[in-house]
């Protein structure tokens, strides 16, 4: 699967997305669980800056990969996969999910939140990035599967089970949503048991 292989940018993208999603979760969680004024505190600003630079760096890497595929006129197998991503049947996952929610909206909401000193905009950026990261992983998995490993491979066998066309089934969506709900529930229970809000302090102040 050529789309799944690459040079230095591939492992860097995985590490960067892990940092981005972690910062986004912490930022959204901290803003959402803080019973205080909407003015961001030091921890909010630090997480927001980490998220901002991470998103910009990720956007630069993805732009380079897209330019690389476009400059080859989509002629390589990896280029064909990129063409499927940007203009295929699920183009909205890339343009709305990955570009809009992962790259554009977080940058503007973070800058707006820091300028207006309103942590609610920072919380929105965290939630937006979490959804965008999910869309980014869909763009990594599905196009890599639907593009044949070499030309005419999809014509060698004619059977529904051997088709390269793929989209998650209802069962797969249900399992994913169910596991996500269990993880969120476990987190909320642990947070309540540890009485998180009474012991987390930054600079000697309760946050």
What kind of feature is each model-predicted range?
Residues 135-155:
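Juxtamembrane non-transmembrane "cap" segments at the membrane-aqueous interface
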Residues 122-127, 173-177:
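Hydrophobic alpha-helical transmembrane segments
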Residues 159-191:
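A generic transmembrane alpha-helix motif of multi-pass inner-membrane proteins
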Residues 115-119, 149, 181:
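Catalytic-face loop-and-helix region of soluble metabolic enzyme cores
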């Amino acid at each position: 699967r050529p789309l799944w292989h690459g040079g230095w940018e591939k492992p860097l993208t995985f590490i960067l997305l892990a940092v981005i999603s972690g910062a986004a979760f912490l930022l959204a969680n901290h803003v959402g669980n803080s019973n205080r004024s909407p003015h961001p505190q030091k921890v909010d600003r630090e997480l927001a800056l980490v998220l901002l630079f991470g998103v910009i760096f990720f956007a630069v890497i993805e732009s380079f990969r897209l330019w690389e595929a476009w400059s080859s006129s989509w002629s390589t197998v990896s280029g064909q996969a990129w063409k499927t991503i940007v203009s295929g049947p699920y183009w909205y996952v890339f343009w709305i999910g990955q570009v809009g929610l992962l790259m554009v909206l977080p940058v503007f909401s973070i800058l707006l939140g820091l300028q207006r000193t309103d942590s609610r905009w920072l919380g929105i950026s965290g939630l937006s990035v979490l959804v965008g990261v999910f869309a980014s992983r869909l763009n990594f998995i599905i196009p890599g599967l639907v593009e044949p490993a070499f030309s005419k491979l999809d014509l060698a066998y004619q059977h529904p089970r051997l088709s390269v066309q793929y989209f998650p089934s209802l069962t797969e969506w249900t399992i994913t949503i169910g596991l996500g709900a269990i993880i969120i529930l476990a987190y909320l229970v642990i947070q309540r048991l540890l009485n998180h809000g009474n012991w987390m302090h930054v600079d000697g102040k309760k946050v």
